[in-house]
Structures are given as structure tokens and as C-alpha cells.
Amino acid sequence: MKKSYILLFLCFCFVSQAQNINLENKVNKKSRVILQSGTYSLPSISEITMKSLNNTERNQEKFIRVISGPSPLSPESWQRLNKAGIENNGYLPINSYLITLSNLNSKTIIALKKEGVTGMSVLMPEMKLSKQLANNNVPDYIWVGNKWELYIEGLPSIDWNRLQNFFKNLEIDLLGPQFEGVRILISPEKVMDLAKHPMITYIQQKEAPAIPENKIGIKNHRSNALRVPYAGGRNYDGDGIVVGHGDDGDIQPHIDFSGRVLANKSGPSNGAHGDHVAGTIMGAGNLDPDGEGQAPGSKLVYYDYPDNLNDIDTDYGLYGIRVTASSYSNGCNAGYTSFTRRVDLDAIQHPSLTHVFSAGNNGNSNCNYGAGSGWGNITGGHKQGKNVIATANVTGSDIIAGSSSRGPAHDGRIKPDIAALGTNVFSCLAPNDYRSITGTSMACPGIAGVLAQLYDAYRQNNNGADPEGGLMRALLTNNADDLGNPGPDFKYGYGRVNGLRAAKAIEMNWFIKDTIAQNETDTIDIPVPSGAEELRIMVHWTDPQATVNAGRALVNDINATLKLNASSWLPWVLNPTPNSTALNSNAVRAVDSLNNSEQFTLGQPNNGDYKLIINGSSIPSGPQGYWVTWTIINDEVELTYPIGGEVLPPLTTIPLRWDAPNGTGNFSLEFSSNGGNSFTQFATAPSSSRQSTFQTPNGVGDSLVFRISRGSATDLTDAPIGLVGYPANLQLNWACPDSFNVSWNSVSNASGYVVYMLGQEYMDAVDTTTNNSYTFYNINPSNTIWWSVAALTPGGKVGKRAVAVEKTPGLQGCLLTNDVIISSILSPSNNIPDCQNTGNLPVSILIENGG
């Protein structure tokens, strides 16, 4: 019933569109506007008369129009138009605007013509519809009984109370405010009557309901290389960075979160999804070191999704949130919704903020992009924003997961933005456990955690100052490891995150900020030395939020060209044509008028001063700030795990990871057990590989070194690596009122042990011992205490800590030399008459020394 009814309604819509105005008969080719509902050619402004007012408009205080011209209007033009009573309510592609006029008369028309406006139209009812409503793609979730739940917007000054009679006549139920508009319930057959009201500017289906969408991840993302285990190295663990995490209800007790959840603003728990995601972001590995997250120094504010987004205006300042993480869907290929506009606006109002989303788990779905199953199925909505990060899911071997959602965004922009490990991610499960889970839900927190580390890196290298979110997005994407097709693509985005390369760009100050206005040109010099193997450059800008009616989300279009002497290059551009061949094709060099990021890459670039020419091609909302960041990759190889200083268990298979530019030679992998005096080759890897495995030798020591080489390029671990086992069979022997005793199996050839107890936030080392037992003193027997132990190498390096053990409250097996016990109760007896007054009844007991 409902489906056939919708078809009937939409047929009426399209007939209505044709009857309202025959746009193609009044074509002004310079006056074209691209909206969600379609592309419209506007009538010439010279044809506009007072007769064009419809009856419902004649008594309005303001009039809504769409105008267009051959180029964007300048700020000076808008100043003059404002004086004439004409307000800009938002940019529309191409060179068009949604405006309100205080008066519609000959003076108004003359003022618009003077500024170059050539086309003008009433905002017709069909122009106000979202793409889904206009294309008869109405999701089931908007039905509430026999009505649709919709979101509507009106004039900026609209008083919704003044529309009560209008709503009553259409039997519309007003549900309440949301974003810049209100939520309503309306019968489907009355939607076009609603759209005809002159004060209504936009109508969309309600936002889609939210659906939830590390051991290896830390190495793959190069997160480990940002917080090395040897003295004097990088220590970017996210210290002081606050992440706003929205998920599935109350985060449950887990010692990996101890002391670092600043606020828990969620309701009752609805599952383990949030616990797992939180652990990937900031888990300390207190229970199990293998469960450590990307940024164990960061802190968390936890919410019910989407309150981490809804509350950011307050909590950006209150808690200092700089990164958010949301692993929830928001409709499949939902387009540029009111929620999308909201998160784009957040990046403008809170310049140091970065929203991170999962790309979605609908990789095999058909979400009506037009290319069939497998393309255009990003699950949002908000994750299709221009100023946010959407994360794809790759396996431990850097292969895109089949379930990971593909781009493009609804208007052809590059999505996802980046990829991270989301397959078999090992992270927290309440209470005090772990589990491996797969999905872009698990990839999103990997990016949020690495971003927390990079924010920390920026602060440490810039006197504690915060970076802008636009810079962090550019650093993250420009320094990713390219996977899949060469250059960006609609599966991996710009590639799998490489936190180390991004941190180096921060340390080298390989970035610059500037602003540009309409038709301005800037030139930025980038010197490239001899011997470079790869040059990467990215231009990125935090683009103004789009008008929700717009068919293309980009507002300000910056175009860049790279030059060296007589040679020039354009940025990489993808083909968004809705067929699988085009969408899966390699990027080509071309002018980009869709994205607010433009990337240039050159292999084996000639040395010299490259000139990046930045042009303000179309800046209707300017001047526009932008970032340029670049990375120069030399002919080097670099081991990223093990990086040096680690202590590994013997006879254990470990991953090896390294970075290197593209090349043709194989990699040679070697190890030394004598501090580098001699090496033994254990593997070769093809030129395309950046990972391998190794089984650590048997025994204990302090002198394990790895070496990797390709041709003349070689790298060693930065510090010797230790070898020692970790204690097993941790036992509580006894617990008394002020102490408890523990023991463990001895570790072969260990020089001693470090004993740990859970402190306020982390497992703190409390003592060392050469025994395989230890007594903790000055302990409150009523407290729960977590403890663990690690072995020491002969050189005193601390090995892997054993999985922590919980000592529960109470006494156990306590033998005391002086122990007072109550052996019996002498009075009162156990036979007390009901009528006896017990108020002053004497009590007598027999006490004995039970020691």
C-alpha cells in the first residue's frame, strides 16, 4: 500500500514541476542552478515582474528567490545589496544564491542587475525537496503510522508559531526544533502543499536512525613509532588530548579506562560496541598490554551517540574536546543533509576540531548512487561532510574489507577519506575482557586515536598551541600510504593512515596557511633537494557549510597548479560518473571543482624550487583560508616496528613493518643477536610489500637488532631489543588485613622482576624483586586491587607485563600469630520472649586468642 501510494504522490510532484514553469523554454545558459532535486535553468531577470508573485506571497514581509550570474558576487556587491534590502541566505552551485528580499520592485531588480545577476526564479516547491523525496527514494523509517516524519527549514527569521494555523489546516504535527529547522509529521499527499508555502525553503526525510557500524593496528598505523620505548625518542601518546566519543550507552567498568574518562554523559548500556571502540582510541593496556589503544595518554568524554556531535558547541570549551569519534550510520548515501551541514559548520565555529566517522559496512549495497551495488554506499549523511574524516576498513595486510563502504559521496566527491585497520581488531570488552571485532566501526577509532597523537605532536612542537582541524585533515590524508589504485580512489580514499610520516611533516614545519579571494592568485615556493624519490603536496581548505538545497556541496572552489620551469601538473581527480568502470578507474590529472582537497604527487621529482599556483577560481563566501602541506620522501627505508627498545618474548611470531618509497628492488630482512656485529638474513620481501613476520630466537638477552635494506638504502632498529619471557601462573597466596602475598612461575634466566599495581590511571611499578613471590603492604583489605609482574633481562630491561590479576576485597588464608576471635556469645541467649524489652539488655561474649 505505502509503496504504491508514494509512487502516485511523486508522479504528482513531477507533473506539478512541469506545470509550474517550463524552465527549458526560458533558458538563460549563464543562469543554471544545481539543486538536490535537479538542475534548473533560471528565467532571465529581465522578465521578472510583480505579476510573478503568486497569491500566497503577496502579503509576505519577505520574498525568497534564487538568483544566478556568470560569476560569484563579491563581498562589496553584497554590501550594496544588503543596503537595498537583499540578504544572502546561502550559496548554490553554480554561481547562484538563495536570497530574501524586503521588497520586490523595479529598484530591487535594478540593484541585482547592477551586480551582474542574470537569472532569477521563485524558489519553486520542487526546488525545496531533498534528493530522496524528489527521486521517490523514500526510506521506510520515515513512516510514523500513516504520516511521514520530515525535517523542514524556513527563512532565517521564521517564527514557526506564526505557521500554526497553516500547519493545522494541513494536519501537520509539530514535533520540535532540530538544527536550523523543525521536525514534523505530515501526510504524504500534503507535502507539496507544504512546499508551496513561501516561507518554507527546504524539506527532507528525517535523519536516518543510528546503527552501530589493536595489536596489529598500532603497528600498521605507525602509532607505535610515535611513542617509542627508548629514551630520547618521540613520545606522542595523546597526552592532554580529549576525544568526544558517542556510542551505544554506558561504557562499562574496565581498568584500561581507569581515571581517564572525564565525563560519562550516556544512558544505560546497550551493548559492548562503545567499550570496544573506546579501547581502540585510548585503552591503556592495564589489563593486557596487547590491548593498548592508539593514544593511551588521551582522555575521553563519553556520550550516547549523537550527543558527542550535538553537544560540541558547549563541550569544545568545557572539556577541551578536539577530536570526536562516531562509528554509527546516518542513512546510506543520504546526501548532504541538515546534519551534514551541521558538522561542516562545527569545523568553522571550532577551528581546532576534527570529526571522525566510520565510512560504513555497506560495501556490497546499492544505495541509489546510480552505479548499482558496490559503489556510492557511504552510510551518511554527516560522514559525507567536506570538513570531516570518513574511514574505510582494511585488513592487517592492507586489503580493503569486502564490507567496507565505497564512495563517492552523493555529488561525486572523494569518500572515504582514509583507511585504517578495522578487521579483527583486538580491544576492550566489559567487564575487564577483550575481543576481536571487525568493521569500519573499529577503523574509525584507529584514526581518532592517531589524530590524538598528532594533536599531541603539534602541541609539543608549537609551544602547546592547538592546530587547526583543516591542517590535521591535510596532514593525515597527504601522508597516508597509497593503496589500491594509484592516487586517491573511492575504496581506500587517500590510503592507509601513516601517523609517523604525518608527525614528521609537523616536526619539519612542512605546511603553510594563507587566504585567497575571488580571482586572486597566490604562489608558494616548495624547494625539493636532489635525490628525492617522491614529492607530495596537498591543498586543503575548511569549506563553508553548504546550503542544504544545493546539488553540489562545494562552496568555495580553489584550483591549484604545480610548476617547475616549463613543466606543469594538475591535481589528481577521480571520475564520479555513475558506472562501475568509471568509478574504478585510476585518477587523472585535471581541474577539480568538486573537492576541498587537491593532491599532487610526483615520483622521482627533479630538484628545484617548485611553484604551487593557487587560484581563487570561485570564492562566493570569502576570503577563504587554506592550508598547503607537503612531504618529501627520500630513497630510504625505515623500520617502524620493531623500532628499537622493545623487549620481546622468545619464540614468538612478531610483525615487522617498514616505510619506503616505490621501487623495483626486493627488501632484505636480517637480524643480529650480538648487537649488530653480524647479521643473518631471515626473509626477503617483494618491492610492493611493507610488512613481514619473524619468530624471535630462544633465550634471554639485550642485543637483538633488525636490519632492512634495498639496494644501497638500509636501516637498523634505533636501539637494541631485549628478549625475555613473561611470568605465568600468577597466584594470590594469602590476604590479611594490611597485606597480601602473590607468586608466579619463574622466568628462565630473568635477572629479576618488576611488580605492578593499578594506580589512578595506569599500572604503576611499585617494586623490584629477585624472588618469584612478593608481599604488598599497607593495603586496605576492603579494596579491589589489580596487580601484575614483568621479568627483567640480564641488562635490566623490563619485559612484557603479564595479564593483570584482580585481588578482590576480603581476607584469604591469613595466618596470624595474634588473632582475636569471638568464640561464643554468652548473653543474650537465642531464646528471647517477644514481650521482653531489649533496649537495655546486657551483651556478653567470650574472646580468645586464635593465633
Predicted regions located by residue number:
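Substrate-binding/access-modulating region of protease and related hydrolase catalytic domains
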Residues: S157-R162, E189, G238-D239, A284-P289, ...
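Hydrolase catalytic cores
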Residues: T280, A419-P486, L612
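C-terminal subdomain of the subtilisin-like protease fold in secreted/lumenal serine endopeptidases
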Residues: G291, Y302, D456-A532, A550, ...
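Pro/Thr/Ser/Gly-rich low-complexity, intrinsically disordered linker/stalk tracts
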Residues: G722-S748, P781, G796-G813
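Beta-strand-rich modules
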Residues: F776-G796
